[in-house]
Amino acid sequence: MSLTENLQLLLNLDSLPSKRENLIKRKECGLTIMLCGASGTGKTTFFNTLFATSLQPEKSYETAKETIAKKTLEVKKNKAVIEEDGFHINLTVLDTPGFGDFIDNTSCWNTVAEYLDEQHERYLIHDQNSLRVPRKDTRVHVCLYFITPVSFGMLPLDVLAMKELSTHVNLVPVIAKADTFTTPELTQIKQKIRRILEAQSIDVFHPSTEYSDYETAELLDSSLPYAIISSVNEVCKDDGEKSQGRRYPWGTSEIYEETHCDFLKLKKLLINRHMLELINTTETNIYERYRREQLTNRKSGIPKLKKEHYERLNNEKRAIQQKITQMTNETESFFQAKEEKMIETRDALNSELSEYHERIRALETQIESLKSYKGRGHKK
């Protein structure tokens, strides 16, 4: 499937956001979701499960090997159009293959943060240039960060990455593969992660009661981070009914069973209840903060430098520094050679002068001897 191919998907959206009329009034509604986290956390499977389609191809061993061999992090884009009863949502999903896959993952989140800022920058430039041309909104409305759970909560990489990304996008933490933990273990891990998020002042998205009833908003908020199970396969339960989930020798994990995972809660947050809030908070909070900072810190009309500009300027700076260093070394070598030659000349002159002094002293001695000899001969 082409990454830019638009797919017409007819999905059963149980309930559109409670402020559906506000969405319908728009000529079109765009929702951009970013999937971030280390490989193997189930990002692709989750998205295909959420929208009941193979919007993103499952990664094979060869694909993963190629990504690691590249040793680069990139942002890949897939597009689709969700439609129901004449209501259209232009959906864009962004994947981040290569995130956290290398031995040295220092600042691996910078590529993602720069991409997020670049979308805000494009929107800002359009605001400054013209209001007549329709704006193409490529801003990311929500980032689902797939946490790699460990006994003490989460890895330092996840903590640092989430802390950085939370200032650029609506961040929703997700614990993937929840069926690998027992219920008590999952409860403890959730508590530890919530404590870490609070201690590190990581700003995650909290659903508001303005966009859904109090009970729903409170339930969604208290369930953070969302523990999910993803599967595109149907399994047969003990009673003979079919359900989407995973089958194990000891039982079945169902993705739509709220006692098993938070998949339905996350779906309510993204699609059913708080989609409009994600879009609006991106506009009113995140973008406005970016816009205010940029207009305050730089001259009007001057676009923000992109990564490649910084790289070019840094390369030029390094070239100038190398040239200066080379010229300095050449000058020092020139004067050092001159100094050595002058010292050699000085030593030669001093040696010659010493020889003259020795000859003078020898002549003076001879003169004194002649005077003494002549004096003795005169007395006789």
Curated annotation (Swiss-Prot):
Membrane topology according to the record: Peripheral membrane protein
Keywords annotated in UniProt: Coiled coil, Cytoplasm, GTP-binding, Meiosis, Membrane, Nucleotide-binding, Sporulation
InterPro entries listed in its UniProt record: G_SEPTIN_dom, P-loop_NTPase, Septin
Localization annotation: Cytoplasm; Forespore membrane
Primary localisation category: cytoplasm
UniProt GO MF annotations: GTP binding; GTPase activity; molecular adaptor activity
Coiled-coil regions listed in the entry: 304-380
Region (G1 motif): 37-44
Binding site for GTP: 37-44, 72, 98, 177-185, 246
Chain segments carrying region G3 motif: 95-98
Region feature G4 motif, mapped onto this chain: 176-179
GO cellular component: cell division site; cytosol; mating projection septin ring; meiotic septin complex; membrane; microtubule cytoskeleton; prospore septin ring; septin complex
Sequence ranges assigned to domain Septin-type G in this UniProt record: 27-297
Entry keyword Metal-binding: no
Keyword Membrane applies: yes
Task of the protein: Septin-like protein involved in the correct orientation of forespore membrane extension during sporulation.
Subunit relationships: Component of the sporulation-specific septin complex composed of at least spn2, spn5, spn6 and spn7.
Protein name: Septin homolog spn6
Species, as recorded: Schizosaccharomyces pombe (strain 972 / ATCC 24843)
